[in-house]
Amino acid sequence: MKMEEIIAPVDKELLKAELNEKRFLRDTNHAGNKLYIVDNACAPNVLREIGRLREIAFRAGGGGTGKSADLDEFDLDGAFKYKQLVLWDPDAECIIGGYRYVLCDNVMYDRFGQPIMPSAHLFKFTRRYLKGAFLKTIELSRSFIRPEYQSSEQGMKSLYSLDNLFDGLGGLIVLYKGRMEYFFGKMTIYPSFPEEGLQMLLYFLRKHFGTWENDLMHRLDRMVIPKQPVKIKLTRKFDNILTEKDFREDYKILKREIQKMGVNIPPLVNTYMNLSPTMKSFGAGINDEFGNVIEAGILIKFDELHPEKTRRHLSFPKLFSRRPF
């Protein structure tokens, strides 16, 4: 893939003007950062900087679009109703990271009855799902942390960058409570990740999160289907390695075995797996529009988070105004 030269940084004063009190969501619990919600109509300069930072972050991991900025029609066209959750460092006056999201009861559909959204390129959604949980779901996509905040370079700001983003998700849960009940997202695994490590990780996800004893979600694995599925191989070998029934004990084995391969479990994957005991994983597909990264689809119910995660991300002293955004 030919890589275009990435655009120049957007002037900080333009960003500060658009990330104003009207767009404020909440303060983070740690590191003194702030979270905002914007779209292209109210913050075109912020969107431009997000596109620049996303492309830098994704290229560094082995993915990316190859364009000068990672922005598409879902970012730029208000008809699709996508918003951006923005994590801002008020000290360095820069964007640390973010998420793109949409309320699924707002999405449009194509002539085949499939939702017009980024994840529909990777997954087929059955009618049963679309008429049920889908309508109470927030789709998350394009999560990123700028590279400088992925190491210890920024001290406490780096240490809490991903945690701060999940403070933002906690803010969304509170903001849309009563209307939305689930997060639908994708866990990205880059091509540089060892093949056997990928296989073991997918096996682990299927073993511990492949079924869900919830009436609405029963047999969800038959409701959301990867279009280019990654098949799990070496099953017999993993049967003899990941032998624990308890998630936490089996997770210790997974972590140790992955580290033997010279890598760690990707941070976002690691965080999602420890977010909810009832998280649903329904397989992984190849994203051929994004550097052939592997994307594992997941669904998380708001009121089934681990209690410590609820306390950590949904309890905060400075409550935002309940605006419709």
Over which residues does each language-model region extend?
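Conserved N-terminal entry element of GNAT/NAT acetyltransferase domains
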Residues: M3-A41
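Short, solvent-exposed loop/turn elements at beta->coil junctions and helix N-caps
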Residues: A69-D75, G285-E289
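Short, flexible loop/turn elements at secondary-structure junctions
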Residues: D39-C42, D89-A92, R100-N106, R142-P147, ...
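A short helix-loop-beta-strand connector motif used in the catalytic cores of GNAT acetyltransferases and
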Residues: D75-V86, Y109, M279-K280, F290-A296, ...
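C-terminal non-catalytic accessory extensions
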Residues: G291-F325
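Short amphipathic alpha-helix that is part of the acyltransferase structural core
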Residues: D27-E73, K83-L103
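Aromatic sugar-binding interfaces of carbohydrate-active proteins
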Residues: P267-N274, M279-I300
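Acyl-donor binding region in acyl/amide transferases
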Residues: E55, T65, N106-P277
